[in-house]
A protein has these predicted regions:
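Active-site recognition of the HExxH zinc-binding catalytic motif
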Residues: 65-86
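Active-site-proximal segments of metallohydrolase catalytic domains
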Residues: 1-45
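Arginine residue identity/basic-tract feature
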Residues: 15-16, 36, 40, 52, ...
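Active-site scaffold of zinc-dependent metalloenzymes
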Residues: 32-33, 37-64
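Short catalytic/ligand-binding loop motif for oxyanion handling, primarily in non-cytosolic enzymes
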Residues: 31-34, 80, 87-88
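Active-site-proximal beta-strand/loop segments in catalytic clefts of secreted hydrolases
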Residues: 25-29, 62-63, 81
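Hydrophobic beta-strand segments of well-ordered beta-sheets in folded domains
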Residues: 20-24, 56-58, 99
């Protein structure tokens, strides 16, 4: 996908005050990234940043041949990029204790959503970015229903509440 042409054709720079972000749905091989940040000071957002003369915004690219689980995964990769940039220490700890978008806390394999191995996780350590209980608790895929979409929802739901503004309001990232 030619991002410059897309931005020009839809006058996204001139109309920047009319939207918070842009979502594109397309088919396979349309060539867009899952997420890309555009603006004066964009960061890597699961794709190379694209510097343009406007406040930052994100273009999300979704494939209509894929499911809601994959759309949530694309969004979760955006979350990973933004949090790794803004809160690197906290986010590394979160990933070690809760898991990454691809790898739940109770496995070492990508996409192993139905793993019933019990393991310790500490999701509730991060409501204010400070550990309060180093023990955590034992759990497995039953936490998210042992499905991909369940894991994406669970992973996003366990993020600290005070990071959502950073994730969604990227104009000043």
């Amino acid at each position: 996908m030619n991002y410059d042409k897309f931005i020009q054709d839809f006058h996204l720079i001139e109309r920047r005050g009319e939207y918070d972000e842009v979502h594109i749905w397309g088919g396979p091989y349309f060539g867009f990234y899952e997420s890309r940040m555009i603006g004066r000071n964009p960061i890597f957002c699961n794709a190379p940043p694209l510097v343009r003369p406007c406040n930052n915004f994100v273009i999300m690219g979704f494939n209509y041949e894929r499911g809601i689980s994959e759309a949530l995964e694309a969004f979760a990769h955006r979350v990973e990029s933004i949090l790794a940039h803004n809160y690197p220490t906290m986010f590394r700890a979160y990933q070690r204790q809760v898991g990454t978008v691809h790898i739940p806390f109770n496995t070492t394999k990508d996409y192993d959503w139905s793993n019933e191995t019990m393991a310790r996780y500490r999701n509730y350590l991060f409501p204010n970015f400070t550990p309060t209980n180093l023990l955590g608790r034992m759990a497995n895929c039953q936490e998210w229903g042992c499905t991909g979409i369940g894991y994406m929802q669970w992973w996003l739901r366990n993020l600290p509440k005070n990071v959502w503004k950073t994730i969604l309001e990227v104009k000043n990232v």
